[in-house]
Amino acid sequence: MSENETAKIRVAMVDDHEMFRAGVIATLRDSFDIVGQAADVPGSVAMIAQTKPQVVLLDVHVPGGEGGGGAEILAKSRPYSPTTVFLALSVSDAPQDVGSVIRAGAQGYVTKTITGADLISSIKQVHEGYAVFSPKLAGFVLSTFQGV
């Protein structure tokens, strides 16, 4: 194994749309070590517990479980993989969706309109400890935490 391969960030993908997952994984596979994927809450928690990815791309609206979607996955996965960082990747830019996963501990939130290059950059940034938000969401997040 080359030095470059050993340095790849371990990434998992959670989304209930198989074709979307496949497309994202195809985009990311040259840059990251894709260690797992899942489509629902119970499968996601199990996959994260088993693979212990460094970063999870997490859709907000995922079926199963108790109806909490991405926030529920994050909360239930934490005990099994406490160092995993979560980056929400969703079509939704609704304040309640953004707030739910950020309050649950996600390191960032980007929308599915993101380019492949920007998604790769966002994954690297959250892995390094930075918070990442789509430009459209950054103002909302700031105003929420500033009490505006």
What spans do the regions from the language model cover?
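Short amphipathic alpha-helix used as the core "switch/output" element in two-component signaling
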Residues: 46, 67-83
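Two-component/phosphorelay signaling modules centered on CheY-like receiver
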Residues: 9, 18-36
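Short, flexible helix-to-coil linker/hinge segments that flank and couple to helix-turn-helix
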Residues: 96-103, 108-148
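Non-catalytic signal-transmission and effector/linker regions of two-component phosphorelay proteins
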Residues: 1-10
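Active-site residues of response regulator receiver
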Residues: 59-61, 90
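Conserved active-site segment of CheY-like receiver
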Residues: 16, 89-93, 112-114
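The short loop immediately C-terminal to the conserved phospho-acceptor aspartate in CheY-like receiver
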Residues: 54, 61-64
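Short hydrophobic/Thr-rich beta-strand motif most characteristic of the beta2 strand and flanking loop
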Residues: 32-41, 47
